[in-house]
Amino acid sequence: MAVAQFLEGINEEITDIRVMASKYDTSRKTALIYIAAPKADLNQVMSFRMRDEEGEITVRDIRSKHLNGKFIGLEISHEMGSDAAWNRFYRFMERMGYA
């Protein structure tokens, strides 16, 4: 089963995902993952983990998003520099969609 977590045992619900490809290097892609209502204690968050039966993808680029001074969620930026990394992320997202 595929899960997305900031902290062990606390599964997060992904609100939105946007994938962008580099204009000059099509093998380089970035996924922006949005979580509007994180369940984890944000003071303890150090990384974002995407786990499934293949293993774990860990991302450390996490940004707090605010609108007019109010917290609206978190944005996780996952950079993929190869087709293999993109394929792995795609397989995870397929599993996450079925979970």
UniProtKB/Swiss-Prot annotation:
Coiled coil: none
Compartment(s) of residence: Cell inner membrane
Signal peptide residues on this chain, from the entry's feature table: none
Keywords: Cell inner membrane, Cell membrane, Membrane, Photosynthesis, Photosystem II
Domain of life of the source: Bacteria
InterPro entries from the UniProt entry: Psb28_c1_sf, PSII_Psb28_class-1
BP-aspect Gene Ontology terms: photosynthesis
Chief site of localization: membrane
Membrane topology of the entry: Peripheral membrane protein
GO cellular component: a single term: plasma membrane
Family: Belongs to the Psb28 family.
UniProt xrefs under HAMAP family: PSII_Psb28
Subunit structure: Part of the photosystem II complex.
The protein's name in its UniProt record: Photosystem II reaction center Psb28 protein
Organism: Gloeobacter violaceus (strain ATCC 29082 / PCC 7421)
